[in-house]
Amino acid sequence: MTSVVVVGTQWGDEGKGKITDFLSADAEVIARYQGGDNAGHTIVIDGKKFKLHLIPSGIFFPQKISVIGNGVVVNPKSLVKELAYLHDEGVTTDNLRISDRAHVILPYHIQLDQLQEDAKGDNKIGTTIKGIGPAYMDKAARVGIRIADLLDKDIFAERLRINLAEKNRLFEKMYDSTPLDFDAIFEEYYAYGQEIKQYVTDTSVILNDALDAGKRVLFEGAQGVMLDIDQGTYPFVTSSNPVAGGVTIGSGVGPSKINKVVGVCKAYTSRVGDGPFPTELFDEVGERIREVGHEYGTTTGRPRRVGWFDSVVMRHSRRVSGITNLSLNSIDVLSGLDAVKICVAYDLDGERIDYYPASLEQLKRCKPIYEELPGWQEDITGVRSLDELPENARNYVRRIGELVGVRISTFSVGPGREQTNILESVWASI
């Protein structure tokens, strides 16, 4: 029984897809356990970029099983589109399995997402308008439609009719918005269900059988710990649990079967959308990092906010997700800077604190306390070991490991598979 969980430790966009793809080489099953198509991940294979939003990164290994678990909310329209994209690129999807217990995102979820965000005015939370939150709301309210329901024509029609009638009343009475048509949605989405039917099964059986047989299973999280609905910067969060604990709920695998948790982070910090960001940069250094790091959202295309590495955030992520290993990405983006900074603590009203406050009002008053290290000018994109890094870059990497309190297993100096360097094999140490 061997399992590894990959989680983002910041606000998403840390390079989880790349690290999952890298670790997938030694896994036999790869599974997503939460989120939806609001999370984009980019994988580079032989110089070619593949951008996925819903299907696990492991799909590029045809001999391995890729799983969309029950904790994921699935937009069938997006899924069918993504399948077609992969097929057009010559990628087989015969190895995909989708949980029959996963909940379905429907057009009324997306419309409600947009209307709710618009109604917030200046208090918007920066949702991707993918219907994720409303779909999870229906799930919690026990009125959601699952993949198993989508495949049954009569059940789907009955539940869609009830849900749409309620949502249309809401659209018309509360938001003065146009109601949606039952027949159009039913016809379109039932057809999508038939297209994905071949992939649908009880994925908890597949995952537990694989683990019981001694196979290596890799769990892939979406977003990041700081976007977790319980542990993140609430309410500027997603509607699910990206933390490692979300695996057990979102996959049907018990906590006793989880061996390692790999936390993925960048050598700096980025965030899409609104919400607290203590180390955010507004100067030319921030702009340089954004441009060199191509910091634009995979899903939204929006410029990401960028800032210095925040070890307070990282220690919070380590604690609430039980991180055992760290994967440090995008070190190369910092090349050329005269100095680099790491936030080691916050100043809150004159008091030094080393924890991440839950209160948004306190976070607004938090000022980062920095440790400054000398930068490096060398191009490190061809580096293949820690010893090959310039001394200043090597010291920066080591200092991050010390401040976070987790050993660094891999570090990356570019987007390619070959630019990921192993310091310690996660699989071998289990």
From Swiss-Prot:
Q: How is the cofactor bound?
A: Binds 1 Mg(2+) ion per subunit.
Residues annotated as binding substrate: T298, T299, T300, G301, R302, P303, R304
Q: Matching InterPro entries, A to Z? A: Adenylosuccin_syn_GTP-bd, Adenylosuccin_syn_Lys_AS, Adenylosuccinate_synth_dom1, Adenylosuccinate_synth_dom2, Adenylosuccinate_synth_dom3, Adenylosuccinate_synthetase, P-loop_NTPase
Keywords per UniProt: Cytoplasm, GTP-binding, Ligase, Magnesium, Metal-binding, Nucleotide-binding, Purine biosynthesis
**GO BP terms in the entry:** 'de novo' AMP biosynthetic process; IMP metabolic process
Q: In which pathway does it act?
A: Purine metabolism; AMP biosynthesis via de novo pathway; AMP from IMP: step 1/2
Could you tell me what this protein is called?
Answer: Adenylosuccinate synthetase
Q: Name the lineage.
A: Bacteria, Bacillati, Bacillota, Bacilli, Lactobacillales
